[in-house]
């Protein structure tokens, strides 16, 4: 084949041409799709071997949208390899270490490293988006295989930004290169099997944000067969892309992609994203606060007319950027918000942004503060400045697992843990949204249907949560996220109450806006996996009692704060019961709207008992909570 100037620089930079002439490299071409569809052995003694990876150009030029899945199995026995895929990506295998390097800027490549668990065969996979308004990056991941050719370990899913030219090349006619890398073998070879490319396609839709909403999460595996089965098993969840890929068609385009049985326990699926221009904390916060795809904020160009992005995403991203630019510590968030609201005209652009939407600002800044605090705590040498631009590792966590830990090399990244959310259980009907007029398109019938589905999936109702409108939207659609709290350890967590009247008092704005208005909020229903109920405890002490902290630690078996446990006690002496969930437990909850309305004419008033629908009251019984320790102290939480 002919080496074009487009990819000569990459090949040279990798050392792929070292020790061999330009012409000899051109003579060592092979046909990956045909020769290696079943199995092939490449002789690497003379330097570079190369193969075009052509696909039907009509696929990339279609008016639809889709994903190309390239894959091949590299057999064990040769651990010293260098591979390249055009100018886009290089892969170096050196013993147990696989290094990835690539990106849109040759002088500033993104680098990732993965340590294999064994020296057996492994499968190289990369996903290329195609079609209308596609994302601007590819995904790369490794599947390790055991002696029985079963999937035994999976790397994180790595994101590498690409320019339009490179993406187009990868989708049509990329070139694959391979050579031995510092091999001690006299006759180095490489065995490849099951090389192939498949595609999933669907007709274009006008709302790009929905089509690509899972591109930056572990759920991207749900797009393709057989990766959807891998996702379902590892995450112990169900691939559910709603109607975003309705009518999608999957087919093999060339070669013979492998399908592997699984020999792996349900485990975390991790997805690592690098933000070339920094700003990852601001992007992660906007993603969480506004329930917008994280992939959105890695793009250089955004679709026009995206209301949620313009009304929430951009303002939140700008707000966090302003806070960072002011060089304020994240433990000052509450005071900064109070000062901005108490003194109109103060605080510059940051103060103005807070006053424009105070509750959205409170939600966003407390989320960002919690992420920064967790980042600083999780790695030696991490600091608040590093949190602003660290990589993001999105973790899809098995529901029934214990602590959801990131990969060993993720201590320098912002970690986002993802569990099922209320959005998956809302059923058919109009879009759900929260306003002072009530929860739009939500009915008692939809509530009952959601409740039944949750029970079938192993969830149990544990109480109500009252909050302001922006938080309700974020919690139902994006899940509960830890927020910073300027409180003693015993009070830190997510608050719920079995009595809706108690939660009702919190269903309002926390602060008045610039005109002194406080809006009514929303009541939500909180469900936890039934398997987590042994971690629920009850005490007769008020949590304000001096001896309460010691009593709670005795019950939960580890020092405060709460983690995968909860404590229920009276809000005051002789008062109603409230429950605090530890943030790691709260992240596992599924939260859906209640059908109990809040009254915009009586904000801060008492709940009218007659407003509670009989059918909702009938499904709101609480489980029993333990009042004595039911398990030994957790060593990992001491």
Curated annotation (Swiss-Prot):
The annotated active site, in chain numbering, is 578
Signal peptide range: 1-25
One annotated GO molecular function is: nucleotidyltransferase activity
Q: Name one GO biological process term.
A: symbiont-mediated suppression of host translation elongation
Result for mutant: residue 481 to H? 52-fold decrease in ADPRT activity, 55-fold reduction in GH activity, 31-fold increase in dissociation constant for NAD(+)
Q: What ranges does the record give for the region Domain Ia (required for target cell recognition), renumbered to this chain?
A: 26-277
According to the UniProt record, where is the region Disordered?
596-638
> What would changing residue 571 to A do, according to UniProt?
833-fold decrease in ADPRT activity, 4-fold reduction in GH activity, 2-fold increase in dissociation constant for NAD(+)
Activity regulation per the record? Inhibited by 1,8-naphthalimide (NAP) as well as a number of poly(ADP-ribose) polymerase inhibitors and other compounds.
Region: III (required for ADP-ribosyl activity); residue ranges are 430-638
Q: What class of enzyme is it?
A: transferase
User: Which region ranges are annotated with the description Domain Ib?
Assistant: 390-429
- E.C. number, please? 2.4.2.36
Positions bound to NAD(+): 465-467, 474, 479-485, 578
On modification after translation, the UniProt record reads: The 8 cysteines participate in intrachain disulfide bonds.
The record's disulfide annotation reads 290-312
Sorted alphabetically, which Gene3D superfamilies does this protein's record hold? 2.60.120.200, Diphtheria Toxin, domain 1 (3.90.175.10), Exotoxin A, middle domain (3.90.1350.10)
Q: Which UniProt keywords apply?
A: Disulfide bond, Glycosyltransferase, NAD, Nucleotidyltransferase, Signal, Toxin, Transferase, Virulence
Q: What is the effect of changing residue 578 to A?
A: 666-fold decrease in ADPRT activity, 14-fold reduction in GH activity, 2-fold increase in dissociation constant for NAD(+), loss of toxicity against mouse cells
* Function of the protein: An NAD-dependent ADP-ribosyltransferase (ADPRT). Catalyzes the transfer of the ADP ribosyl moiety of oxidized NAD (NAD(+)) onto eukaryotic elongation factor 2 (eEF-2) thus arresting protein synthesis. Has an LD(50) of 65 ng/ml against the human lung epithelial cell line C38.
Q: What is known of its domains?
A: Domain I (which is divided into 2 non-contiguous regions Ia and Ib) is required for binding to cells, but not for ADPRT activity. A subtilisin-digested fragment starting about residue 417 and extending to the C-terminus has full ADPRT activity.
- The protein's name is Exotoxin A
What organism is listed for this UniProt entry?
Answer: Pseudomonas aeruginosa (strain ATCC 15692 / DSM 22644 / CIP 104116 / JCM 14847 / LMG 12228 / 1C / PRS 101 / PAO1)
